[in-house]
Swiss-Prot record:
Protein name stated in the entry: Osteocalcin 2a
In-chain residues carrying the UniProt-annotated modification 4-carboxyglutamate: 133, 137, 140
GO biological process: biomineral tissue development; bone development; osteoblast differentiation; regulation of cellular response to insulin stimulus; response to vitamin K
Propeptide regions on this chain: 19-118
InterPro entries, alphabetized: GLA-like_dom_SF, GLA_domain, Osteocalcin
PANTHER family found in the cross-reference section: OSTEOCALCIN
Organism: Oncorhynchus mykiss
Amino acid sequence: MKSLTLLTICAVLSVSLSMNDLALDVVLDPAPDPATEPAPAADSSASSSASSSSSSASDSSASASDSSDSDSSSASSSSSSSESASAEVTTEDPAAATEPEVVIMKRDLASVLLRRKRAAGQAAAAFTLTQVESLSEVCELNLACEHMAETAGIVAAYTAYYGPPPF
C-alpha cells in the first residue's frame, strides 16, 4: 500500500513538473491586444490552419512560441491568442491545481480506511471475546490470513480466507 501511494505521489509530481514546463512557455507569450490585431485576411489563414486538425494546432502553437520573439508576429498573434486563452482556462498554475487533488486523494483514502475500521469494529462487536479468539487461532495457521487480520481485522480476514464465521 505504501509503494502504491509513493508511486501515485511520484506520478502526480512528474505530471505537475511537466505541466509547469509547458505553462512557462505559454505564460511567457504576451497576450495580444484585440485593437492591434492584423487585417482579416491574415486572421482567416491562421485560423483555418489552426482549426484544421489537432496536429496542425499543436504545430502552430509551437511556431507561435518560436516566432513571438521575431519580427513576424502577424501570423502568430491570432494562433497564440487562441492558445493563450485555452492555457489560461486549463493550466494557470499547475502546482496549485495538483495540490487539491492530492488533498482530495488523501481525504478519500482516510475516509475509506475509517469506514473499513468502523465496519470491522461493528462486525467484531457482534461476536463475543471467545468467538473472536477462536477466529484468530484459526487464522494464525495461515500467514496471509494473519497479516490481513492485523491490517483489516480478524473477522474480515477469516471471512476472506475461510468463509463466514460458523457462529
